[in-house]
């Protein structure tokens, strides 16, 4: 997060999440099961002449799915291992929100087989969990603060990039987009990065990596991320990266500018009833208007 201190300078802040009890969410009216995925794809094709089908791997609650939706993609399948993430995704998006373990070869093959029954897939996108490559995790390991079980989990996650590439190889979408931490392409981890590039090129993709600072595009976050795009040679033009909106971090959107319109809450807060309301006075700046424009917000929430 970006925060301006008392003298107007910007400081990075790391926030620890505080979780309350989970809430039950109803499924989206256009959601479908994994077995129903080919039928769902056929239904979309009957409505849209040339739909752009996308797949969101390691989807979480659906941040990337929302971006793809706004870019005119139909996200027919989203996969994640966390139940609460999939329940949230299923509430907000149509298509299949599939809870699964993408580290398993059987799961990879099942997903690829189902997608190949759906016709042409325009894009496979996602960010394989990056803890093994993270500087933060390496620092914690150095200080012996990570349990043996956590270390074992991280080593399993080290190979999730391969799950992503394996699905790309089997499904052969027109394009793919992988996001990860920058350390994956730096000293000590370059073997993984080279393997991703080599396998994608061997599968017939033109590769175009890009280091992106989200704050340059209006996101209140300082961490740089590595994006690797691949487009099918002779089928797609190379991906063109958007030009940055900001050149100086002093111009970037701050945390206050992002959420100052929201009512104050304590950690772990959950409403007791869905009809519980609290006062909302509306967005205070252009960024907040942009972030809230897809919500149906009454005078009271």
Cite the ranges covered by each PLM segment.
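Core alpha/beta nucleotide-donor-binding catalytic domains of modification enzymes
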Residues: 24, 28-36, 40-172, 182-186, ...
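Short, solvent-exposed loop/turn segments at the edges of secondary structure
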Residues: 221-223
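Conserved Class I S-adenosyl-L-methionine
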Residues: 192-207
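Conserved beta-strand signature within the Rossmann-like core of class I S-adenosyl-L-methionine
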Residues: 174-178
């Amino acid at each position: 997060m970006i925060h301006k201190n008392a003298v107007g300078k910007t400081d990075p802040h790391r926030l620890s999440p505080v979780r309350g009890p989970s809430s039950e969410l109803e499924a989206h009216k256009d959601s479908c099961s994994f077995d129903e995925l080919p039928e769902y794809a056929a239904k979309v094709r009957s409505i849209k002449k040339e739909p752009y089908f996308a797949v969101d791997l390691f989807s979480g609650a659906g941040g990337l799915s929302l971006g793809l939706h706004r870019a005119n993609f139909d996200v027919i399948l989203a996969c994640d291992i966390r139940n609460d993430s999939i329940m949230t995704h299923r509430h907000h998006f149509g298509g299949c929100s599939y809870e699964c373990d993408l580290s398993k070869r059987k799961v990879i093959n099942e997903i690829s087989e189902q997608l190949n029954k759906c016709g042409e897939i325009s894009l496979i996108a996602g960010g394989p969990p990056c803890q093994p490559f993270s500087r933060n995790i390496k620092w914690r390991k150095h200080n012996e603060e990570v349990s043996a079980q956590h270390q074992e989990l991280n080593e399993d996650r080290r190979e999730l990039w391969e799950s992503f590439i394996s699905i790309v190889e089997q499904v052969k979408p027109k394009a793919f987009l992988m996001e990860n931490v920058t350390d994956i392409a730096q000293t000590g981890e370059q073997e993984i990065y080279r393997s991703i590039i080599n396998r994608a090129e061997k599968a017939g993709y033109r590769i175009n990596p890009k280091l992106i600072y989200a704050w340059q595009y209006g996101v209140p976050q300082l961490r740089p991320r590595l994006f690797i795009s691949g487009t099918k040679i002779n089928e797609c033009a190379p991906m063109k990266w958007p030009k940055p909106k900001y050149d100086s971090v002093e111009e970037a959107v701050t945390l206050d500018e992002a959420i100052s319109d929201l009512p104050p809450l304590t950690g772990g807060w959950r409403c007791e009833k869905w009809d519980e309301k609290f006062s909302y006075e509306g967005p205070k700046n252009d960024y907040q208007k942009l972030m809230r424009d897809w919500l149906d917000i009454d005078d009271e929430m």
